[in-house]
Amino acid sequence: MFVDFLRSLFRLRKTNVSILLLLTYLTVGLIYFYDHEHYKHVTPEQSRFKDAPQLVEDAWLNLQNITYSYHPYFSRDNNRVHDYLLNKIEAIAQRSVHVSVSDDASNNRSVLLRNSFVDGGAVYFESSNIVVKIEGKNTDLPGLLLSAHYDGVPTSHGATDDGKGVVSLLGILDHYSRHQPERTLVFNFNNNEEFGLLGAVAFMEHPWSKLVHYVINLEGTGIGGKAVLFRTSDVSTAKIYQNAVKSNPFGNSLFQQGFYEGGVGSETDYRIYESNGLRGFDIAFYKPRDLYHTTKDSVQYTSREALWHMFHTAWQLTEYIAREPIDNDDDFTPAVFFDVAGLFFFSTSSKTLFKWCCVILVVLPVIAFNFDVISFSQKRSSYNQRHRWGVSIRLPLSFASSLLLLRFTERLLSSHNTFILSRGHLTPLIALATEFILSNYLILSFFEYLLPTRDFKTTALRQVAILTWIVLFVCTMKLYKSEYKYTGIYGIVILYSFVSLAGIIGLFGRVLKGNISRESTDNKGDSSRPYGSHGVDEEQQRSGTSAIEESAGNLEDSNNEGPLDVSTTNNSEHIDAEERAPLLGSNPPSVADQPGITNTLKIKAVSVVNYDWSLQFLIAVPITTFIVFGCVDLGLDALKQTIQEGAVATVHVWNLVFLGGILLTLPVLPFAYKFNYLTAMSFLVAFATTLSLCFLQSPFTEGAPLKVRFSQEININNGTDAIVNVYGRKGGFLQPMLQDLPSVKQMSKDVWCQDELNGMERCLYVGYQPNPLDSQRPVSTEDIFSLKVVSNDKNDHDRSRYAPINAELEINVRENRGCTLWFKNQHLDRPPVRQLTVRHSDNTSDLIKSSQGFTQLQLHKLDFDQQKYRVGIQWLPKILLMDGQEDEDNDQLDMQVTCYWGEYDSESLVNGQHLRKLPAFDELLQYSPLNVSYANRDRGLLTITQSIEL
């Protein structure tokens, strides 16, 4: 009974293959569920930090207070958050002599410098960073910077971006104020990250920036979940993370590659720190992106568990760096890293990975080729060349046909319900993966029915290995050409290595069986009889048939891939002496009973090798499926909602789904013809269900909404109408929604839409007039914004026509913190503006020059009561810029000035009435469908623009 059980358990038969496959998918699914849920059950009480429970409760309370209202840099509530943090920090500092506080706002710190994000740009910024230093016991050690920004965008409460980072830093500051670290810690609670990373820029001008060498930057580009290690400087810092974060590590160099390639549109303060020579870690929440920068980035939509994950990760890192000695033998090569279900974290040098890729790309094919040569030489005398080609072309034909079908389905899906990915990526991914595997199953099973064969799986594994070898070769070349920054290829390395190894095991089995078969033939002479089989599956054979009843002469043919002999012998049923043979036979005969065999152990060796299929499956399928699914899932989870940001991203993400469906099923294809009926039906049901959902479900829900962007603009040159601009993806979503607004219907307003670049659309209509400030009379545009040319020597007769032209512009604005000046360069190859001066109320000024010229100047000030900017502009006459072509009457400078207001969720007292600051935006929020969310289009929700000539 037990022997029969073992025989049935280890045969290559449909039931066994199907069970192993379903167990693989079940295991991957359970690990996936564990990975996404386990962090919620790791409580502060389980931490090695004794004060963690209280600090987390304090952090949650601080988060609630910080996110009480919208607090972008361009709002008065930004000052409230600054003052709240400063009071908390000063209270902590008073308890320790090791803590020092520097408030940029109190110290009137400002910078005027080139804008690295804008070609020809300059930026003036008045900082209100709060910088804190905890003096370490050993001041000779390079310090650690911890950074987070406390500003938000006008449409977001900023709970995740970046409230959780800020309150995590407060908690860590509180802890180390009472437990002095070995290494000096510097905290940068910075302001105005959202519009230029300016808080980080200002910090690099602070004296304490010279104390730090490492940085931990906390950020949020989603609203919850786990905080991921987006990127790290090099393999040395990746090893620090690996050694430090033992509880729930979460990081993947796929994200890092996305940043290197520009696939991620957002940037963080980490970029500024890294460009200034700091090494460290960029840790952030990354999903869901359609709630990022919207009103749902609030405490209501996040959790203590998410806060604790970021807090705990940053704390573990800080503890390790602050307390432990760090090896000075630094490796600055980019790192390849990933975690395994939050249990383990792996990291290595991308240069090391490149070397391993080179070895793998050479060694594994050479080994496989040698086994191929040996196997071919063993069977060439009886080899059926025609049948070999019949076996060899099965998978390529099946793969190509299924690929075309899959591409057709993907195109049909992406055209019929383009944005279904925004709702969720798993449904389309499962639909395409199950379709691909079903198609291959049907085609390969049909081939097997027409012409049964032995050991197709090894041939197929070799072909899959060749395909993945090509992919790995291309990725390896990209890794080298990118200076080892192509750090997301580890999944392809694992896929090729394991599939290739499984194929080599099959080839080794062929060779071993071929050697024993040849010895058997030599000993037996001509006494061997032909091998017979009906080519049926093991489920159709009876256990009463003994393995050794197949005489040793049958082994002659066991090495062949030729067609099964369907002629019957005296025994009407035979067990394959190949991969379908039983592991143990009933009542095995003695050696004397087998005149052609001199060693019974050889028969048992062949029997064991006949079960190499299980080893091949376990090597080729479970691990590769888990790793590849993890890579595809992470990539799609991060990028799926970028399809709302442009047509290019849409194509890229759908291609990723297409490739993901193929990569997930590649290791299974060699075994697909061995699926049983129930497994095939399970795939069919999964395919039909997920495909139907993809076609029938709405792409947008309240939890996964359509994300559109809002701004209201008054262009003084075109009149005083306040034009509402709503930006979103083209697809007929915006215009019907806007036409249903009460103000549009009641006043018979026109809503006109126009195509923008990259598949976007902009719809406009005349909205309610804004009320950005208090006034005792109705507010006009001139009360809010006006321009005055204080001086201009362009037409001064004392100025040589070759001399630079100087002018001074006064921008009068109320309740304002930011403006931008654009200098237009019509008919010129080079920007004419070469010098900019920002004058202050105390008669001091900041000046910046450039021989390359300026195209833009951003102005950021702190004082709402300061109602004007004064800017000096110097530009060259066109006679110096047009290769000697004189144009004396055309030396004016064309420029445009735009100023921003970021508040909407409050009222202004106008002419004795309480009026909402931005009623047009209120109306959109009130009457838009629940499956629509709003983010800001510009720096402010309200912009006023005027173009002038100097």
UniProtKB/Swiss-Prot annotation:
Zn(2+) 2 binds at residues 161, 194, 293. Keywords: Glycoprotein, Hydrolase, Membrane, Metal-binding, Metalloprotease, Protease, Transmembrane, Transmembrane helix, Vacuole, Zinc. One of its GO terms (molecular function) is metalloexopeptidase activity. It is a multi-pass membrane protein. The active site is at residue 193. Residues 519-570 are annotated as: Disordered. Residues 556-570 have a biased composition (Polar residues). The record marks 292 as: Transition state stabilizer. Residues 36-355, 410-426, 481-487, 636-652, 696-950 are vacuolar. The keyword Glycoprotein applies. It is found in: Vacuole membrane. The chain crosses the membrane at residues 15-35, 356-376, 387-409, 427-447, 460-480, 488-508, 615-635, 653-673, 675-695. It is an enzyme of class 3 (hydrolase). GO terms for biological process: proteolysis. Glycans are attached at residues 65, 108, 718, 843, 931. This is Vacuolar membrane protease. It comes from Zygosaccharomyces rouxii (strain ATCC 2623 / CBS 732 / NBRC 1130 / NCYC 568 / NRRL Y-229).
